[in-house]
Amino acid sequence: MARLRLTIAYKGTDLHGWQVQEHATRPRPRTVQGVLEPIVSRMAGEQVRLHAAGRTDAGVHADGQVAHVDIPDHKLDVDWQKAINAQLPDDICILDVRRAADDFHARFDALGKRYTYRLWLTRRFIPPKLHGQVWATGPLDVYAMDRAARHLAGTHDFAAFQNQGTDVTSTVRTVHAIRRCPSGTLPAGALLTYGEPYTSWRCTGTHPDQPPATAGHPLAGIGLELVWSFEGDGFLKQMVRNMMGLLVAVGRGALAADDVPGIMATLDRSRAPATAPACGLTLSEVYYPPCDYPYAR
């Protein structure tokens, strides 16, 4: 048998997450694993199982999900990327297929992951191409959110940010970096990294959290998109969405940035704000050795 490593992208809007739901009543919910495995099994000539780096929830997207699968040696000459993509629906795509070491494991060999979360800072309307891919929050105090994010970065017990339904032995995780990034339509500049200086962009409106006043700006009078990036050695169940829910609560003024350490110290999920919607979250990248991941031990 030979092991393949697949890099996968998908739009999660109409998907019930990664993992096949074998015990669900028929018709089974549509999942990424449930779509891919029958295709790969037919091509391999036998039943196969895909193992992913992370089991994304229903509605969550991916630009860089990684999975491994074992196939017969005599199937190595197949153009797996082309052949799988020819059979996939429009919301799932294989970005890369390569042979991996026989002991490679998509989940256990990962050095870290990067998730991104997209916010849309108005509720007046969402451009059609962003439907199901952003959380429309309305205006936010992004500078208060910056201050709150400083408390989340680093090594902490994140029990207050873990939802039920997991069997992990430890809730201590390291968030290496939290970045407030420019989207493709925003000025460059915003960066917040744990332990490093950062800068923030400003809009040209009357208030830094309002849409730009410049008539030629592509978002003038409409709203702003903010993209937050979270890098860490691993994340608990819905941890990124729970951190994003906290940051938005701070941005709305429901909490102060200085409330964050106290909430974390309780280790109590009920003390933290509600989970952010799945629609804004994307698994953007999974890091493996050898690579230039700056936080690798």
Curated annotation (Swiss-Prot):
GO molecular function, one term: RNA binding
Residues at the active site: 57
Residue numbers binding substrate: 115
Keywords, in A-Z order: Isomerase, tRNA processing
Keyword Ligase carried by entry: no
Lineage top rank: taxon: Bacteria
Keyword Isomerase applies: yes
Reactions catalysed according to its record: uridine(38/39/40) in tRNA = pseudouridine(38/39/40) in tRNA
Pfam families: PseudoU_synth_1
The EC number(s) this enzyme carries: 5.4.99.12
GO terms (BP aspect): tRNA pseudouridine synthesis
Subunit structure: Homodimer.
Family membership: Belongs to the tRNA pseudouridine synthase TruA family.
Function: Formation of pseudouridine at positions 38, 39 and 40 in the anticodon stem and loop of transfer RNAs.
Protein name, UniProt field: tRNA pseudouridine synthase A
